[in-house]
């Protein structure tokens, strides 16, 4: 479908929540995207509504195919393979234990459950970092806000204000728009949840 036809269709059936650049991507390989007119672009986007894995990477496609043949998705109310391993890997990386993370990643990739389980157990003197898995930046940001307020409440210090940087963007939910501190994004949705204060980055 041409860009013009796609624009016409979306003008009728897709909510106009933000402006779009007049380009329709129809294919991607590696970091190259191809528009409907055949023009190629380099994909440098990361962090806003994107999946930063490249396009058509054989290793990613193979992993996706293998996983979807086994199990597509289940609720997080159940245990699933590799969630604990990935969380252990992230904890090691947060501790700057690159070598330990590499050994753990290799064991996970090789399917060596015994080694991966042993390596994943924290050492007695190891700082353990817990992971909250989220499916979007807004959900991750709201999760961090909830954790900060829960920590302050449990610490008994009465702190419940989140400090936000002016000019930042934290998501499209009501709470993350309140944290975004940009009037042009907030005006249409007032009143907003409270508990945020803005500061200007230096």
Residues of each region from the PLM?
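Short, acidic, Ser/Thr-enriched surface-loop or helix-capping motifs
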Residues: 35-36
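Glycine-rich loop-to-alpha-helix module at the N-terminal edge of alpha/beta enzyme cores
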Residues: 40-155
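Conserved PLP-anchoring active-site segment centered on the Schiff-base-forming lysine
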Residues: 151-171
């Amino acid at each position: 479908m041409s860009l013009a036809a796609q624009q016409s269709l979306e003008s009728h059936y897709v909510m106009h929540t933000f402006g779009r650049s007049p380009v329709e991507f129809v294919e991607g390989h590696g970091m190259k995207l191809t528009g409907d007119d055949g023009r190629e672009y380099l994909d440098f986007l990361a962090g806003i509504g994107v999946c930063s894995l490249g396009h058509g990477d054989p290793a990613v496609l193979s992993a996706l195919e293998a996983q979807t043949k086994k199990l597509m998705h289940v609720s997080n109310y159940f245990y699933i393979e590799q969630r604990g391993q990935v969380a252990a890997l992230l904890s090691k990386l947060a501790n700057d234990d690159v070598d330990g993370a590499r050994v753990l990643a290799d064991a996970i990739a090789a399917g060596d459950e015994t080694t991966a389980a042993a390596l994943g157990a924290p050492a007695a003197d190891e700082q353990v970092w817990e992971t909250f898995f989220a499916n979007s930046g807004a959900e991750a940001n709201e999760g961090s806000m909830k954790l900060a307020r829960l920590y302050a409440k449990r610490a008994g210090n009465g702190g419940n204000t989140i400090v936000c940087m002016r000019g930042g963007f934290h998501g499209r939910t009501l709470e993350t728009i309140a944290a975004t501190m940009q009037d042009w994004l907030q005006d249409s949705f007032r009143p907003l949840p409270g508990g945020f204060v803005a500061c200007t980055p230096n």
